[in-house]
Amino acid sequence: MSGPASSTGFHIHAEGLHERNVQPSKPTSDGGVAPKALDDKSRVEEDERTDSEKKTFGRTPGGTIFTVPPTRDMVSQLLSPSEPKNLSDIFVLAIISCHIFLLRFLPSSFRVAAFAIIFLFWRAAYNIGIGWLLHMQSNGRTLVCWAKKSNIFVNPSTGRNPHPVLYNLLKWELETKIPEQYSFEDAPTEYNTWLVFRRVVDLILMCDFTSYCLFAIACGGRPAGEGFIMLALRWITGMSLVLFNLWVKLDAHRVVKDFAWYWGDFFYLIDQDLTFDGVFEMAPHPMYSVGYAGYYGISLMAASYKLLFISILAHAAQFAFLVLVENPHIEKTYNAPPPRKRVAVDTDNVKPQDDDVSQDSSVINDNEYSGKAVATLEPSSMHNLLGPHNFDLYRITDSSVLLIQILFSALAILTPSTPVYQFFFVLNAALWRVWYSVGIGYILNRQSHCKMWTRHFVKYGESNQEAWQQWKGTYHLSMTMTYASFIAATWKMYSFPQDWGYGLVLLRHILGASLIALQIWTSASIYESLGEFGWFFGDFFFDQSPKLTYSGIYRYLNNPERVLGLAGVWGAVLITSTKSVISLALLSHTLTIAFIQLVERPHMQKLYGQSLRRDAGLVRSLKRSLPPSLKQFHGSVDKILDDSIEFIEEFIEAARPKLAAGVKTFVKDTSALFQKYPARITISRLEPDLAGYDQKDYSISLEGTQSSEPAQFERASDKEGEKARSMPDRRGEQVNLMFEYGAPIKVKWTAPLNHSKKDWIGLYMVTDNTSREITRISSQGRWIGTNKASFDSLTCEQGLISSDIVINKFREDGEPKDVASGEMVFSGDKLWWTQGVFEFRYHHNGKHNVMAVSRPFEIRIGRFDDDAIYGDRYGLVRAAIESALLPVVQNCFDRDPDIAPQTVEEQYGSLVDRNGKYSRRVVFAVHQMFGIEFAPEVVRADGNVRNLAWRICNAKKVLAPYSMSRTNGATTPTAEHES
């Protein structure tokens, strides 16, 4: 696990807040820049060549190119006397002064509680308030929509700005702050919106920091009986952390400037490459990780557990902000999925590979679907081991792990904590640790040198893939047993404190829990970077080694498990403070380092050679900051360590014991895990005034792709009564509306000419609403506004084709009348991805009053009937499955040309691997069509329709004796056969 990440399935991307890598790449969500815009930019650059000062160019989602003027940082603008001040600066300084006055005049008994509430308020304004604004801006460009709807940046002389006073105030405010290269009238709306957003952020961040410092002053004190040495250590350590925090902030701002500091890429992008060094080579997300070291330094100087707990809460909230707001936007903007290769695959030359572990399955040749050739070309499965979402009781590895964990827990809890039991639990933990490092290390060493593990399975006729699966189970069981035994031993040695306030008891528990959390995060980061292949040492088993990429946590550390990967072990030492646990921790750390040096490192050097880097980002940063004398000392220490390790390797090679490796075969099944999402509850809003609107002027009509004939004729099958086995005779009625699963649906609507511009149409299940006048359930995003720029989000405009086209319509009473009409298309996430009967509802003025309801229509997936296919059963059935499956898969992939295949051989787009909703749609459709339930990972592993069709054929053959449908194959033996 110490190796760098595989290049398959993982890409290096920029870090979080204030540290995203501002590349000149195009954002993936809103399209690129028009050619005309690029020509405009070329002309601008040509005009500016004579300018000695290098300028930065910004690019809005609409393609507008503009010059980004230089700005100053927040602290300089507010506190520097040389910087011009305006009303917003005075307002921020006044709010900060109010906080200071509160500390001065509040009674001492109320200060702590009052400033705790004040700080939590500003922290909530930061993480929840700013987080919500950025989330809405990222997904629907809400802030820019607000600005455009209110016309606050439009010159009042045009007559379109109803707020001339606000316009003049904003113009004076912003031009005072940016005196160079900036014009309020000429700047795009996105940039002006960002500048206003900056002022709000300045207020929140300054008040957040000020209230925290004042809260620390209110909580500060000196513990009773504290000696001078402890006092000095506490203050020296605290000041060091604060100074380190200050350096992190300054260095981060030096690198990313104001653009990333204030989340500029939520509004526009800049065409500029930034060099990330300094703090960005030391730790992932430094503004969120090491950038909060000052909190703990101040808590240490204040000697207050109240302040420490508040600091931990604030730090956790910041990580939540990163995960929920920053990372999704960064992934969407900078880490676009690579374009799909549309080169046709020569299926005639595909060779079977038993040891194929790639996620890109081979395309299967039509002529090779017979006999044993089918088994050799089976696409690899994607039923991973790690993670709660991959836990499967049908798999022997998972069920064994669960049963053993239950047994260990019962033994640890039910047995007394006597010295005898403590000894055996500690001994058991030590033995498992020895096996995990020495035993597993020996197996991997032999596998690296002579393929011992693989040869054993090949000897018995198994494939390399089977050896790989059995190894994964063995390693997973060994790892879980090692940590379970250590936890059990720690539990036995732990004694519950009688007085949490005595000495450093509470602090030890807090630090211990923090170290445990650090190890969990490190393990998750390692797995995220390496995947299953790297986590289980896949390059020991497969010669087709992937290209090295240092991404994720490996961008900063070469071997994160060397220190951070064992932080939880030392956390247990702090919590228990017993010699036995200290011994286990020392043993674990020593064996882990030996495993890395004696097993992993030689194999990595043999496999990757010179492509291995010597120093990680953190080491490079530290070396640059060391004086020359210490650099030479570091080199000498490295030489001594290398010589010592080489001596140990030679000694072990000469005296290595012969270990017998007996491994039993495990049974593995695949089952699906579906995640259920809770329903969202909303309160219906009623429009009080509906006078002047005639509901006869409103109408909705539908157009869609009709479902297949099997789906339409299922209602008239022989399972019905005799009179119901034929299609119903419709007398003067329209045909039944039955649309394909996932196919786009076009909605045509009419409304009065004076209808509200905030009208909208939503998609619902018929059974969800009992009232035809009011909708009392949320559309859950399945709605589109009838007019553009009427709502505060762009997502509600996706699918809108036309609006307010005047047509002459005959009403139900026969009277002709001019009405407004429009069209929209519901597709993708705006559809229901299940079967049922649905309807569209036209709502009035942004509320839930229903003005028109469409005809009910049904979404139905027809059952595939292969009994009607004769001749070459396998070949014809598989071809028929491919033909039936291709349009369904295309619908499941939103008919997006970047991910939806055009032929059965074409590979899926890479976005299918990133977003699990696509594969879940496909497995639902397959289940309804063929009665076969797959896991979503199967769809991603197969990679194209042909492989998926083969898997369905194979599953139908395997499950044929248990099928509930008619079949021409073998059935249960009759009495005649038995006799």
Curated annotation (Swiss-Prot):
The keyword Iron does not apply. The keyword Membrane applies. GO terms for biological process: methylation; phosphatidylcholine biosynthetic process. Pfam families: PEMT. Residues 1-89, 135-199, 249-281, 326-398, 446-474, 521-565 are lumenal. One of its GO terms (molecular function) is phosphatidylethanolamine N-methyltransferase activity. It is found in: Endoplasmic reticulum membrane. It catalyses: a 1,2-diacyl-sn-glycero-3-phosphoethanolamine + S-adenosyl-L-methionine = a 1,2-diacyl-sn-glycero-3-phospho-N-methylethanolamine + S-adenosyl-L-homocysteine + H(+). PROSITE patterns: SAM_CHO2 (PS51598). Residues 1-63, 335-362, 704-729 are annotated as: Disordered. It is a multi-pass membrane protein. Keywords: Endoplasmic reticulum, Lipid biosynthesis, Lipid metabolism, Membrane, Methyltransferase, Phospholipid biosynthesis, Phospholipid metabolism, S-adenosyl-L-methionine, Transferase, Transmembrane, Transmembrane helix. The chain crosses the membrane at residues 90-110, 114-134, 200-220, 228-248, 282-302, 305-325, 399-418, 423-445, 475-494, 500-520, 566-586. GO terms for cellular component: endoplasmic reticulum membrane. Belongs to the class VI-like SAM-binding methyltransferase superfamily. CHO2 family. HAMAP family: PEMT. This is Phosphatidylethanolamine N-methyltransferase. It comes from Paracoccidioides lutzii (strain ATCC MYA-826 / Pb01) (Paracoccidioides brasiliensis). The lineage of its organism: Eukaryota, Fungi, Dikarya, Ascomycota, Pezizomycotina.
